[in-house]
Amino acid sequence: MNDYTILAGRLKRGILDFSEKICEGMPRPVMKLTANMLFGMAESRSCLLSKISRALHEPISLKKSIERLSIGLENLGESEAMLENFAEMARERIDDNTIFVGDGSDLTKPYGKAFECLERVHDGSAGKQEKGYWTLEFAALTHGHKTPLPVYDRVYSVSEAGYKSQANELFKALQFLRETYGSQGIRTLDRGYDSNEVYKEFFRHGELFIVRADKQRNVICKGKTVNILQAAKRLKGKYALPFTTKSGEIKYCKVSVQTVSLPALSGRQFRLVCLHGLAEEPLMLLTNLEQGDPRLNTAVVKVYLMRWRIEEHFRFKKQEYGLENFRVRSLKSIRAMHRFACLLTGFVALLSDDRNDSVLFSKLFHISQRIYPPKKSKRNGYFAHYAIADAISFVLSKTLVGIRKLLSNPSRSAQLSLPGFA
């Protein structure tokens, strides 16, 4: 027994309990696959099946272990039930003020040739076109620590059978949120989704939204059709808003609110919220929040002045677990691998969000040995995913047995069995 045996046991039990909850109503082999994948990815910090298999320490050959996981991923596919179960787990942290941040990203495989439905995508990191897949995710920002909880994810290709458009993929995500949480929360999207069809979808279902407007859009302001950027520049800023950037710099911004409508939706009223002082051009947001709604200004702060958290969420998955380094080739397996990465990120996020009440979080954060630990005044808003993931990997790597003993059915003791009935 080493100094981490008890802590490793708690982590294993936590991963197993988490796997059982997100696999509720599913066959036991699926739950066992989930526990193995989450444990292996957490210890190895990789999405390579070879490294995951080594972390499991199974009493079979490495080749057989890789084959077993590969077959399991292929059979699992998208696994909507897992997504629904995790969304239900997050329900207790969701209310009418919750911000659902939606954004698209990419999984690039620039040198890939044998991957199914591989197409050209825009690599946001490199700023150029590469081979890969599109992703769409929604995360719910918790109130206490602004922790992003991944409640929806999907990997798709424009060349796959049944693909229609990016707008249709967005409508699928919105429908999932609608079926899970009803009209709770505020849907927020970046300017890439500034579309009349998207606004019609929101109004049709009575959902609150905040969308960053494209500067090419025209609006009807005081009875005249004008460019939205020109309309925003006329507003001087009525409300003062001090803001601390990610680097710690304090900026003093001003917020203006103006009622406008759109030429294609003239019967609907929007609030144009402009944030001055953050950049050279004002930040322009279109929302259907009412003028007197107290969430109007707070939502702006949570969504766009804290938007780096959802971007950090994407970056965390790619850097911590090497998500773009996957080797599975079928689209079903890629989706399953991405789903497991999101679920593991969700497991870390739940630990991080309970930081004030969790002894486990305190121990893991101490083990992570951050070079620049957060100050007490900034501890609540600290993005702790990297620290927790590092500590989990370190603790689990100290064990010589994977998670298989917790998954196995213990044999009956012959001591308590009658002769002939054992």
Task: Give short role names for the model-derived ranges.
Residues 38, 66-145, 256-259:
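Active-site-proximal, Lys/Arg-enriched surface segment
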